[in-house]
Amino acid sequence: MSRRHDLEQRLRKLGEIGEIMRSMKNLALMETRKLSRYLDIQGESVLMIEAAAEDFLLFHPQLAFFTPPAKHALLVIGAERGFCGDFNEELLQALDGSGSPILGVGGKLCSRLEKHPAVAGLFDGPTVGEDVPRTLNRLVPAIRHLQDAQDCQGLTVLHHRSGVEGVVRKPLLPPFTQKPVSSPRHPHLLNLEPGQFFAELVHHYLFAALHEIFYTSLMSENQRRIQHLEGAIQRLEEKNEDLARKSRTLRQEEITEEIEVILLSVEGVVQR
């Protein structure tokens, strides 16, 4: 009886764990649908800024960044939460060992980067799409400080992207490094001095591009989480089935023993 009781307790606990896992999977699935809408909008914003920059640089090519910067920093975007497989491990393996200053984002990733000699800053990451603006409000000033303090004018982002195997390395700063290919039309009528306008444009581009990258990373993270949880739920269900079979077997044995006791009692009464 005690063995079957222990099995039933384990079954109840596993059932509760399974419900939690299914809830986590459903939340991740809902997040991917929301992020899909965000990505469509943000992707259009980035394209519009890039088109405006290309058009502007046709008339002000002296402001463009055609010379690669001497120093680069790395922005590594990992996961704030777990249950996403080797998401963070792949990012750590992608670090090139060049000694470039590293900005890490995501609690789970940052816990692995704490003792890295090149770390220049560690930040909590977003768990849902609505957290991204708050994360960027802390991150962008750190990028600016790194540019001023260590003269790192280049910034490369390491992150995951859905449908792409491995880690994506995206050069983000300096922006607009490709020479314009369009033909000049009419010069812009600006209310700002061209250099000031271009600086503001770069600032807006940095925020827009980082929004898109973070949404992309969150999408990949949640897809990994769904896949990871599906595998865990399947293994849990298999374990449940195995324990349920054992519990039924023990119950059948108990019933058999009870029948034998009853039969022995009946035989004793008859013999008297």
Task: Indicate residue ranges for each PLM-predicted region.
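N-terminal assembly/interaction segments in proteins that build large macromolecular machines
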Residues: 1-272
